[in-house]
Amino acid sequence: MSDRRFRFGVAGSPTTGAEWMATVRRAAELGYSTVLMPDGLQLPSPFPSLAMAAAVADIRVGTFVAAAPLRTPRQTAWEAHTLTTLTDGRFEFGIGTGRPVAEQQTVEVGLPWGTARERREQVIETLDLLRKLDGDRRTPIMLAAGGPKALALAAERADVVSLAKDATTPRSEVAALAAELRTLAGPRADDIELAMNLLAAGTRPLPPWTKRASGVDPDELESMDSLMLLRGTPQQMADELQRRRETIGATYITVNAGYLEDLAPVVELLHGK
């Protein structure tokens, strides 16, 4: 379905500067293309953290994803453009309307949460402002898409689309979502890179935090054909990712930083493929 080669990213956040630098350097050594960071007041700010990451290793960096309601559109566009400039184009700007936890956080920063439509318009305004700031240098855009309106926006504006469904969504439904995206994108379809995030990879038992992340007990999640898991030997995992590329079109695979080493053999097996 897709002629794109695979690339791999690591999603995490720093607890200390030394630990963050070690993670970034290790990701680069293992062949990952990108270090990504989520956004939220419970975490360090992603923008200086990613600037630090880009300074310690020759690797791409990205927000995964910036919560639009936590900043004004002008502020977010300014931060994103600054990273594009400082990294010499190695920054990928992921932005979304914010997870439910961000509603209380907007109160803490003195900004309105807004309706779903207002938050979506905030994303659009941010992208428009970033385009003006970038000039001839264009920052790649990542958008998450699950519902019809988000899918339409992603089809029109995104370079990378992360298919935003929960851990229990059937494989057939995700494939249908990807097909709908390609239809909406029309002539842009081949220019859009499909991303898929993994909670876990390899053979280690799932940790307790996977219930918080997925809403499903680890044992139950293991019994499902969840696309947020990639289990088995390195060759089995590589074969499964090639099946996902063929049936869904996903070629940009991101993994939780806790599984950086577990996915590394797969990164090596699929290098250049």
PLM feature spans:
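Active-site-adjacent structural elements that line small-molecule/cofactor binding pockets in enzymes
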Residues: 1-273
